[in-house]
Amino acid sequence: MIGKEATIPEIVLELQELVQPTADLHCYEELSEEETEEERPHIPYKIVAPCCFCGSKLRLIVVATPIGIRSQEELLLGEVQLVCPNCRGKLRHD
């Protein structure tokens, strides 16, 4: 510091010395192939659900992970409804 008051560049310099660590914080650990996360298997599922208009049975065959099929179930029991081909013609598309 030159003079009685510190200037902005001098303050920034002092802060950088406090903030920048001297230790190496990078992780150089490598995972073996056994430790890597295995892909979850895609399993075929048959979904039977009613048409939201006429109630006729709709059958879908999907391939999903166990987590994926649970998500699909939550959607079909909640905010997503299926429509049969006959009722689809009655719908107005935008």
UniProtKB/Swiss-Prot annotation:
Posttranslational mods: Highly phosphorylated.
Listed name of the protein: Protein E7
Gene name for this UniProt entry: E7
Subunit structure of this chain's protein: Homodimer. Homooligomer. Interacts with host RB1; this interaction induces dissociation of RB1-E2F1 complex thereby disrupting RB1 activity. Interacts with host EP300; this interaction represses EP300 transcriptional activity. Interacts with protein E2; this interaction inhibits E7 oncogenic activity. Interacts with host TMEM173/STING; this interaction impairs the ability of TMEM173/STING to sense cytosolic DNA and promote the production of type I interferon (IFN-alpha and IFN-beta).
Motif stretch (Nuclear export signal): 69-77
GO terms, biological process: DNA-templated transcription; symbiont-mediated perturbation of host cell cycle G1/S transition checkpoint; symbiont-mediated suppression of host innate immune response; symbiont-mediated suppression of host type I interferon-mediated signaling pathway
Record-linked InterPro entries: Papilloma_E7 (IPR000148)
Annotated stretches, region: E7 terminal domain: 1-43
Organism: Human papillomavirus 37
UniProt remark on domains: The E7 terminal domain is an intrinsically disordered domain, whose flexibility and conformational transitions confer target adaptability to the oncoprotein. It allows adaptation to a variety of protein targets and exposes the PEST degradation sequence that regulates its turnover in the cell.
